[in-house]
Amino acid sequence: MTIEARFHIDRGEFSLNADLAIAGKGVTAVFGPSGCGKTTLLRAIAGLEYNEDGYLRVGDQIWQGDGQFLPPHKRSIGYVFQEPSLFAHLNVQRNIEYGLKRIKGAAHKASIDPTIQLLGIGHLLNRRPSQLSGGEQQRVAIARALASSPDMLLLDEPLAALDDRLKQEILPYLESMHRELEIPVLYVSHSRDEVVRLADHLVLLDNGRVQATGPVGEVFSRLDLAITHDADAESVIETTVAGYDEAFGLLRLDFAGGHFSVAASPLPAGRTVRLQVLARDVSLTLAHQQATSILNIFPATVDQLVQESDAQMTVRLMAGPVPLLSRITRKSTEDLGLKTGDQVYAQVKSASLLIP
Amino acid sequence: MEVLIPKRIQLSLILALTVTFCAGQVLADEIRIAVASNFAEAIKEIAERFEAKTGHEVILAYGSTGKHYAQIKNGAPFEAFFAADVERPKLLEDEGRALSGSRFTYAVGKLVLWSPKPDVVDANGSVLNTGDFRFIAIANPKLAPYGKAAKEILQARGVWDQLQKRIVRGENINQAFQFAHSGNAELGFVAFSKVKRPNRAVPGSFWQPPQSLYSAIDQQAVLLKSNATARAFMAFVQGEEACTIIQSYGYGTL
Amino acid sequence: MIFDKQDLTALFITLKLAVMTTVILLIVGTPIAWWLSRSRWRFKFLVEALVALPLVLPPTVLGFYLLIALGPHGPIGGLMEALGGRPLAFTFTGLVIGSVFYSMPFVIQPLQNAFTAVGRRPLEVAATLRASPLDRFFTIAVPMAKPGFITAAVLGFAHTLGEFGVVLMIGGNIPGTTQVVSIAVYDHVEALEYTQAHWLSGCLLILSFVLLMTVYGINRRFSVVQA
């Protein structure tokens, strides 16, 4: 299933001009700075922003286009708003059942118990929203959105209104949801952290326009985008658990360009794990170092070089089919005589697991 | 050729004019009269004649007799009171708020059953018995003598009970007239003085019930303050000129 | 008991009038209040001013215009007659119509405020949960606006209890049909029947006070719960 969207929305000083295709599976993050139009785009897809001349196709249904506009209550969506928006006059159970009660017959898919389990809110069912913490309210909101068995889940910066502690409390739930859900998820955020942990695909938005779309690992490594040029430039690499070295407490993770050894707790074999590698943690050598403390070294080809400043360079490498960013000094690039096509070895000093 | 007026005569003339002028000013008085609503137009004409004759000013306040009574009891500053009944002036006299001996009947109210439309009320008032109307307006019998009279007439004709739901009560005789006049009630018991004008035929149709059917609506007036102008006014009202005016407006006089 | 039959009838008529007026206003006023709270039409202020008009108009003015409108020569009365019905002056129905206009802002304004207080978000949420506009209205807006409904009902009722000027103009003071307590009290005073006036007035005073206490009490309770 794919999703095709074209919107042109003018809101006074701000206008959204988006033309994009969204994957029908996995989590697509809509990422960009505040005020760039992410929420407007999400609301347009949900049908909450009425606009003329827009186009939206979801799978084989046309939700908007050719003069038609399907109102939000006829769209099979689940929407989680930024501020917890539970119905104050209903308890948690009735909140969750609200959408469930309104879907007809055959669409009445599996019961909501797994969702309640997944989000850990079983013990809150009889409480009123005013008795819950912000994090608990958002979890209920997510359960409520999922309860109506939507074909698509839309989340508008669901963690933005929470403090760090609550954020950390919910992220694991979101991550397990990511693993369990079979419907496409659109996740709006301005937080790099969240995006890097949760997104499969990325839509980069700035000033009301789509800057880039693609798998998250690829977009984060594109040197033509501003995000790869700040101090936190990183690579996101999908790996699979291959084994565990009990003696040294090292997890072995395989990816298309080689394998990583990372100090971590054991995880079941075959499990996918996402790795975050900061560009400043990646150094390069022309020859494979033997006696070195760095465990993670793999061959790579220099793909692109971009000068950041007088002193710094960003180098885009391909470790097999996987892009990897490296931030080194300009002097080193000259000393090593680096140019596109060169074979080098990438040395990754540390990598963080994004999913424990 | 110059005509010289001797200085002495000039002075005398000026003095005489001044005295007369000043005398006129000094003697010009202002009196306030509370008047029953139904007598409004008649009293207006009478007051105008009085003012023209004497140079005094007559300020008139119209309203229901009950309201005036309550106000006067509570100290309202009227010199005289022209009521629509006998009871209130008598009460004021008994309570010492009016000058005793000043009470007199200034007009006798006449009640008519009237409709602004020409064929509604016949000369015998049989429309009361045929009941061919939705609403009939009267003044509130509890509050207004004209209303009480209307009730008496309806009872005399034996229709009071059966017409209960169709009898619309105005707060005063004027509101009763307004109900009939506007057509909201097809007909009503109104003061004859409301429809009788000097030198004009009565519009619409009406029936004048015989005086025997209802208690006389003697309208009495009483002096409230010992005031020369007020006394003069009262005397004027009882004079011939005033009586003619009063009758031309549909009242009887003694 | 000092009440005579006519006074009791007046009380009954008054209560009947207040109940009917309140019910009609709740039914008719709710969609208007809803529209007023949602609409962004730039001429909305005209409608709001119209609704608020009975707040500032002397009741006698309202009664006067109603008398003309309901009379045989007026637009409503004439229409009624043309349709084979009766003009509405001096009828209980006419009083109900007058009271509906008279008490309109007391019902519509609290409802409008309560609907506005609900805000857009809960309704958007409900829309994403498959609720149609009518469904959203009944399952979200109305329950969340409950304090507003209570206030509107009580104020509309209490205000109609005290109606005088309008009834004076178009009622005709027919005992058993259009004689309400306020007119009865007026008449008692005019006729110097102070005892009866005291009893009727006292009754109305206590009833009104109890009703107002209820409104303020309930609103206090609701604002505490939602805090």
Feature names for model-found ranges:
Chain B
Residues 27-55, 59-62, 66-76, 83-86, ...:
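Exported/periplasmic ABC-transporter solute-binding proteins
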